[in-house]
Amino acid sequence: GRDCLTGVDRNTVAGIYMASTSFPFQDRQNAGIVADALNLSTRIQTLDISSSQRAGSSALLTALQSVRSAEGPILVSASEKRRARAASPLELTTGDGAAAVLVGEGEPIAHYIGGHTEAVDFVDHYRGEGEAFDYNWEERWVRDEGYMKIAPNAINNLLDKVGVSAQDIDTFCFPVAMRRVASGLARKIGIAEESVADNLQSRCGETGSAHALVLLVHALEQAKPGEKILVAGFGQGCDVLLFEATDAIKAVGDRLAISGHLANGRPENRYTRYLSFNNLLTMERGIRAEVDKQTGLSTLYRNKGMSQKLLGGQCSDCGTCQFPKSKICVNPDCGAIGSQVDEPFADKAAKLNSYTADRLTYSPDPPTYFGMVQFEGGGRLMSDLTDIDPAVELEVGISMRMVFRVKDYDTLRGFRRYFWKATPQNDTH
């Protein structure tokens, strides 16, 4: 979402639609958490869309249909972190991922031509209430009766509706892990085989309800003006959306998008660490892991500007920035009382002033790194450090950026608390 909103006035955003089948909360609006992390206005519509692998494409379609009556653009974000049993086929083909697009009127990078939905209660897999893992049906039946019958019907209906020939499609995005399914669909519909988009199976895996948006964003990265992009989402039916890239695609700006984030990835070749991170092993975590991590909800709400939005303060008298915000200005030459106005720190450039690695305190990924982060323009924060490559030595003075991450898991009550952590600023950022 932050990458998508680069260069966008966040006060103009009128809504955020979140899509996932692995939301962290069942009865707390997850889109509201993301809205806070993005420091969006409270005068927006927030919506969670779930319960299907086409939740991402459905969220995008819903936003496109409702944006004309909205008071501004709508951010559509899809994310997924599904659990898979160890050594299962799903573990081999799926991955965690997210993507976001901004939908609105004006001068878009891609013009929406039209969309179509076929709702079919075709159960290729399911995850029942209280279950941690998906139950999957036989793959050949899913391919022959699902992908090869339901999807072509939806795609042909859309092409007939908008008056576009299958031969005019330049990029066909179909989110499926099975090899040759997308190319088989293309042949059946009449789309050129070279127009079939890479499903990114070798780079990130199939990212569930987010994968339609992941493929769409990846296609937009490579699109040229006038090219038509057909994207589908499959799950208890099929969503199909058709876009045409505009001249604005050439000036999209400096964003990481899908390629940049994949380039920032760090391979993990130790399988037991993967199992541990995904709670697929019963681990001895030691007595230091037995701390009660209950979150006081009243305290969380009182401090949510600081904890979820990373808002500090700026003195309206002398201009000094500080974190956290306080009643009295920290500038010894000022000391003004009640002069602080909100100052967002999440996107500020920062440097690492000092750091340490603690091997005594509990961490699921030891050691625990933390250090003093100095923000450009003023303000300091003693912060947890994350995504530290043990093969690359930290250095005082390196550039840092802030990322929104889980701070604590309260396993006794099923609550997770978020906060901001610092991570090294890679060149690709």
State what each model feature region is.
Residues 1, 47-54, 90-92, 132-153, ...:
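Active-site pocket-shaping loop/turn-to-helix segments
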Residues 403-429:
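OB-fold/S1-family single-stranded nucleic acid-binding modules
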